[in-house]
Every structure is written in C-alpha cells, then in structure tokens.
C-alpha cells in the first residue's frame, strides 16, 4: 500500500510473501519487499520499479499516488529484476518520461528489454551529477559492485533521504517489520543476514558510500 515518507515522497512498493528463496538461494521465510518511491515536485520522479510478480499492485499504487499527473523521470538505481522489472511497461505507459540511470546502466536497458524503444528517452548520469525536480535536488553517487557494476544511489539533498539500491537492504516484508504501523521491530537479524549474503563480499565498496 502507498505510504507517505516525507512531505513530497511516497512509498509505492510491494511486499512479496509468496517467494521462498531470494535469488533462488537464500531462504526468506518472511518474504521480501520491492521498494519503490515517488517524489512529487514541479517535476515528478519515480524511484525504481518492482519485480513483475507484483506488477498489478505496483501499477495501482503508482497511478493512485499520481492522481492523474504524469511522471517526468524514472530513476533506475539497479538493473536486477526486483528493481527494474516494469521499466518497459513504464516507458510505454508514460511516453514523455525520461529514464535516468548510470552510464553503465543505460546500455543494459536494451539488453534487458530488447523489444522496448528507449531512443531519445534516457539520461546517463555519473558521479556527483544532480537532477533538479524543483524544490528537490537529487545527487547521484556511483556504487559499482554493490553488488552489480551499474549500481548507483541517489541522495535527495532537500529531504535528506538516501535511495540506496541494495547497499543497505534486508530480507523480510515491511508489514512484519512494523513499517506500516510505526512499530519498532527487530530489523537487525535479517539486515545482517542480507548484508552477509548479498553485499558482504563487497564490503569495501559499501563502506565507500
């Protein structure tokens, strides 16, 4: 379900409690969450999509949150399917939008979504580049090998919020972690297990962030 994170920022991701193994390797008895956000300003930026398994829920969350407005940007932090699964749908649904990704991420769009036409629709960003949405300004920081080579994170300088891709993730769905009811529940165990299995061997790169 959508949830307000900050004055102009809404969470529009989805929990997936039907999945038993993350990346077909790691048991996730509490499932996982696919995290996606919308920043509302003079221009609207959608931060990542979700896995196709949750397409219907994400589309509903997105369009309910937009209230008839059209997004200007889709910021793609990471090209794994749990972040990028609905890029092609988004590009077709919002033909005037621009897809923002790292220099290494842009070529992967056509590799992952060969039937989609991204020509004239992309913006490649590099370390320290910024994107103004109006009041909000995003700064992009490259995070290669956290844990794929094209990964980047973005920092909303106005809100003081970091959109961190996989760098600081955790296993488990958000409902069971108290995200929707503001309860403080244990994040540490599943956060540590996620870091050890997914990002641990790239610890130096994570710490550089």
What do the predicted segments below correspond to?
Residues 19, 79-84, 107-109, 147-148, ...:
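Active-site environment of divalent metal-dependent phosphoester hydrolases
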Residues 22-27, 50-52, 76-78, 138-144, ...:
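Short, flexible loop segments at the rims of nucleotide/cofactor-binding pockets, characterized by
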Residues 42, 53-100:
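Active-site metal-binding motif and surrounding structural segment of the metallo-beta-lactamase
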Residues 2-64, 153-156, 160-164:
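Conserved beta-strand hairpin/beta-sheet module of binuclear metal-dependent hydrolase folds
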Residues 30, 52-56, 81, 200-207:
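Conserved phosphate-coordination/catalytic loops
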Residues 4-7, 101-209:
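Metallo-beta-lactamase
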Residues 78, 101-105, 165-166:
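Glycine-rich, histidine-containing beta strand-loop boundary motifs that form or position
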């Amino acid at each position: 379900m959508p949830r307000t994170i900050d004055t102009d920022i809404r969470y529009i991701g989805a929990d997936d409690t039907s999945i038993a193994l993350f990346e077909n390797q790691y048991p996730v008895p509490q499932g996982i969450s696919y995290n996606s956000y919308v920043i509302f300003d003079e221009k609207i930026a959608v931060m990542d999509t979700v896995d196709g398994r949750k397409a219907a829920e994400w589309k509903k969350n997105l369009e309910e949150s937009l209230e008839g407005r059209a997004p200007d940007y889709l910021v793609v932090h990471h090209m794994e399917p749990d972040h990028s699964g609905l890029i092609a749908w988004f590009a077709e649904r919002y033909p005037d939008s621009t897809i923002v990704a790292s220099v290494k991420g842009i070529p992967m769009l056509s590799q992952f979504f060969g039937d989609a036409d991204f020509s004239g629709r992309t913006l490649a960003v590099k370390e320290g580049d910024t994107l103004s949405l109006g009041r909000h300004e995003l700064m992009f920081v490259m995070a290669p090998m956290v844990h794929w080579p094209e990964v980047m994170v973005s920092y909303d300088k106005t809100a003081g919020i970091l959109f961190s891709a996989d760098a600081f993730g955790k296993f488990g769905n958000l409902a069971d972690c108290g995200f929707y009811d503001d309860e403080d529940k244990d994040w540490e165990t599943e956060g540590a297990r996620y870091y050890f299995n997914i990002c641990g061997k790239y610890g130096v790169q994570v710490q550089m962030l």
